[in-house]
Amino acid sequence: MANFLEIKIPVRKDEGWNEWAKEMRSKIKAAGIPVRWQMFHYHMTLLFLDDDNCIEDLNQEFEQCMSLFYSLPITIDKLDAFTAGDGASHIIYLTSTQIPSQILAVAEDARTLADSMNANYDKRSFKPHVTLGRVPADKVSLEQLQSVLHRIEKPVFRCILNEVEHRYFKGDKIKTWKLKY
């Protein structure tokens, strides 16, 4: 069963989040863009695994990896979109213009661990982002979507990343790690 390792992104704790998100969704709707919004569970996927053959072994290794990974601040300050790998949808996302090197390092470590166990995982290059919604690619071009997004006021949300979770895709948690301060 598909599962993934993610860093939880606590943007909802930011005072301006709800207002900004509501306004952003309203402007996109007013532009006539159909979006299937992802609500409430905001995260940055570090590793997407296609099966669960080695979950116990991976979790032991992830445990060691997470013991070396400290909580860290991040500023979410960019709204954009890209086309998903299958080409069927465009992903509306948030990210940081300055991704902390620790995030890149832990994603690389997770992939190295998965490789060492011959785990079947998504090997596309790591693109740190927080998915907000999906737009059908047959309804709106990426250029049209980006044109609308780039007219929306840029977000600036500061948060502390302090929790990593291994979970089944659209399902139960497998393991949660609270990061050290």
What are these regions (language model features)?
Residues 148-167:
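Low-complexity, intrinsically disordered Gly/Pro/Thr-rich segments
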Residues 83-85, 168:
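Short, low-complexity Ser/Thr-rich regulatory SLiMs
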Residues 5, 93-97, 166:
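Short beta-strand element of the conserved SAM-dependent methyltransferase core
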Residues 76-78, 163:
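Extracellular/lumenal ectodomain signal focusing on beta-strand-rich modules
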Residues 2, 89-91, 163:
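A generic structural signal for beta-strand entry/edge sites
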Residues 86-96, 172-181:
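Short, low-order "capping/linker" segments at domain edges
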Residues 1-75, 100-154, 173-181:
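Basic, often amphipathic N-terminal segments
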